[in-house]
Amino acid sequence: MSTHYSFRSERTTSPPAPVHVRPIRVMLLCSAFNGLTQRAWVELREAGHEVQVQVAWDAGAVRAAVTAMAPDLVICPFLRERVPAEVWTAWPTVILHPGPPGDRGPSSLDWALMNGETAWGVTAVQAVEEMDAGPIWGSRTFPVRGLPRKSDLYNGAVTEAAIELIHEAVAKAADPAFVAEPLDYARPEVTGRLRPAVRRADRSFDWSDPSRHILQRIRAADGSPGVSTELGGMPVAVFYAHEGRDRGERPDRPGMVVGRRHGAVQVATGDGSIWVGHLRNLSDPLVPGLKLPATSVLGRLVDDVPEASRGLGPREIEYHRDGAIGVLTLDFYNGAMSTQQCRRLETALRYATEQDTRVLLLRGGPTFSNGIHLGVIEAAADPASEAWANIVAIDDVCRQIIACPEQLVVSSVGGNAGAGGVMLALGADHVVIREGVVLNPHYQTMGLYGSEYWTYVLPRRVGQVVARAMVTACQPVGTSQALRTGLADQIVPGARATFEAAVVRYARQLADRPDYPNQLADKRSRRAADERLRPLQDYRQAELDRMRTDIFGNANNFTAARRAFINKRPHRPAAVSA
């Protein structure tokens, strides 16, 4: 079987390309079809360009794909491998480097966060023999506030800057008069420098260090590779850290696990404590890439650790009331929701729907939701049974949203969403999406038919034909397409805080409408009519019948797809009929 993966799309015609940029052929060369690459693919197609994606798992496949397409421009949004010389010497090739002009090396964001940089950038660099040393096609800078997680910075400010530069590079490639600027460290705007790869020793900390220093180290490595340390004598990599309480007069020894709550553990530091949400067991060669809730990894080592009181620890689920609006925030690590997390969310939803509010606003975190937790499933003693329990639990969550009788429900999708996470959002009465968000409303790449009432909520919004096309094509959907097809009711531009404030205003306008009682009555009437036509339980049962075959019979290679995803290995998905 071939070890490369690519797909090709002919350019779209709506909306047309801007008049000042002629449509061109663009090859996106990447290490993985990650969020940034997906957004580039979506936006370039929307702009009228012909776009092909090639994942760089095999240099020979890269050379063959580029030669076959003969692109006007090769863009590398996310690339760890070297571009083959046969490519960059024959076709203009631009690499998006996550650092300011002059910055070079494979660990730019790690160094920026560990060094406490308050401003950073992205540079579009032409590929040459020496890595990151080519002529500059453009650059952007942005502020770095607080102690962000590396993955959040990458998926936020870095992605926004990179997308601007991709559009700029395409415009310049279409301009025969354009000449890139040679890298010149004498120029004042060239502020970066060559930095080596971050070593394990560079990331190290001692638990007796101040909490802020430890948080900075962990967050600079969040996503990948994490920071190696020990907890309870177990060698682990730590992820998803949050500030805890001051130690005060407590005699806790730094490095001691002093609390636990909802999968996270509280660890004493030199001047307080931090909460660690996820760990990777470095002593287990069977699960080298498996990040799991911290208490799952530590197991019996934390059996005697006291459960922290409510309000302490990472707040994955929060509810607050703003007048006639109830706001329920779900913020799960990487958007993955385990069985236990789904059960807690179901409880929170039940509480929220019982309040005397007019509108229930569902708000996500940096990632809105990606559905079930593949890591927890993989680590289970019986992965199939855990997958089934997870699916049943998330179905119960989705039913709470769809069948909510006393409020209008608004989904506030400020971050990317995939699979069941998209369907969860679509269960609401109104869906508002931040401009630039990418949705993946499909399951087949994971070898699953899908559940979460997708056969009801997706066709309800886009129609049967478009719904079938979305779940079988398995392609990302951008905000323009989401609005055109009916996946979204409104698209809001701007930074995350601007977006969230706008959605609250949207919800308030719904609550304050003079005809609100009629709106709620219409919602109940439509739901009752749909129920008479086909009960929700019927949709659910039909989906679960298909999922049972996928999960327990592994009919479409769910096991292989899941393991490939967790370990970041290539996988060619099976075809799943919709």
Describe each model-derived feature in a short phrase:
Residues A169, Y449, A488-A555:
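C-terminal long alpha-helix characteristic of the crotonase
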Residues S2-A32, V42, D202-E316:
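An anion-binding loop in the catalytic cleft
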